[in-house]
């Protein structure tokens, strides 16, 4: 795997003490009209599954990484499939 995908750009890195930890789980992602991406995140206190810890200030970088990895092409055609699909980043 390309190491550039694993780390944010140097100019986007924040000082270690500025990062705040929040447990989040990506529960759904789909395309809206106009090929716009829509992602639904939930804090782990709202779900029974243990999820991956992510950095709040790094959320935009993580969303961009997911887009580059192709998650923006995912679509969910039925509401019950969307509600049943819970994705935890490991």
Swiss-Prot record:
Signal peptide span: none
GO CC, alphabetical: host cell perinuclear region of cytoplasm
Protein's cellular compartments: Host cytoplasm, Host perinuclear region; Host cytoplasm
Listed GO biological process terms: negative regulation of RIG-I signaling pathway; symbiont-mediated suppression of host innate immune response
Protein keywords: Host cytoplasm, Host-virus interaction, Inhibition of host innate immune response by virus, Inhibition of host RLR pathway by virus, Viral immunoevasion
Family indicated by similarity: Belongs to the hantavirus NS-S protein family.
Additional notes on this entry: Expressed from the S segment by a leaky scanning mechanism.
Name of the protein: Non-structural protein NS-S
Protein's organism: Puumala virus (strain Sotkamo/V-2969/81)
């Amino acid at each position: 795997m390309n190491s550039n995908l694993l780390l944010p750009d140097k100019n986007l890195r924040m000082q270690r003490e500025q990062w705040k930890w929040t447990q989040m789980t990506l529960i759904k992602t789909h395309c809206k009209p106009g090929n716009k991406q829509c992602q639904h995140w939930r804090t782990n206190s709202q779900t029974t599954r243990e999820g991956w810890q992510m950095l709040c200030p790094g959320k935009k970088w993580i969303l961009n990484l997911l887009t580059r990895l192709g998650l923006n092409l995912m679509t969910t055609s039925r509401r019950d499939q969307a509600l049943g699909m819970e994705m935890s980043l490991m």
